[in-house]
């Protein structure tokens, strides 16, 4: 099944190329545009990527612990709300989906850091 050429050209215009390559297990800092009334500001959301979905057109899920509560946020790759994504560190994992981290607390939820280029 191939994509219609018109749809393919449209997708190429919409797709973002400024996002770094990251995989589940990487810790990323996502700068999110927040609009409050007339003002617009950037808010950082830093956490572990626990899932990527549907390739280039898809989304990724970031999880962090805030004041003892787990917080997950799903970001579409082509969202206008995302200002930038920075990869902070990489970790060694053997799964594509890290949903098991939801049930772990404290030291058990740590991931082993690894050097990647």
Swiss-Prot record:
Q: What is this protein called?
A: Large ribosomal subunit protein bL19
Q: Tell me the organism.
A: Acidobacterium capsulatum (strain ATCC 51196 / DSM 11244 / BCRC 80197 / JCM 7670 / NBRC 15755 / NCIMB 13165 / 161)
- Kindly list the organism's lineage: Bacteria, Pseudomonadati, Acidobacteriota, Terriglobia, Terriglobales
Sorted alphabetically, the keyword list is:
Ribonucleoprotein, Ribosomal protein
Q: Does the record carry Ribonucleoprotein as a key word?
A: yes
SUPFAM superfamilies registered for this protein in UniProt = Translation proteins SH3-like domain (SSF50104)
Q: Name one GO molecular function term.
A: structural constituent of ribosome
The primary gene name is rplS
Q: Which domain of life is it from?
A: Bacteria
Q: What does this protein do?
A: This protein is located at the 30S-50S ribosomal subunit interface and may play a role in the structure and function of the aminoacyl-tRNA binding site.
Question: Which family is this protein grouped under?
Answer: Belongs to the bacterial ribosomal protein bL19 family.
By its UniProt entry, which InterPro entries does this protein fall under?
Ribosomal_bL19 (IPR001857), Ribosomal_bL19_sf (IPR038657), Translation_prot_SH3-like_sf (IPR008991)
């Amino acid at each position: 099944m191939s994509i219609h050429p018109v749809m393919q050209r449209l997708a190429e215009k919409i797709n973002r190329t400024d996002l770094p390559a990251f995989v589940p297990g990487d810790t990323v800092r996502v700068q999110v545009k927040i609009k409050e009334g007339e003002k617009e500001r950037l808010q950082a959301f830093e956490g572990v990527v626990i899932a990527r979905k549907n390739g280039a057109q898809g989304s990724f899920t970031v999880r962090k612990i805030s004041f003892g509560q787990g917080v997950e946020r799903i970001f579409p790759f082509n969202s206008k709300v995302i200002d930038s994504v920075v990869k902070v560190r990489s970790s060694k994992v053997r799964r594509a989906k890290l949903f098991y981290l939801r049930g772990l607390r404290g030291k058990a939820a740590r991931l082993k850091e690894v050097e990647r280029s």
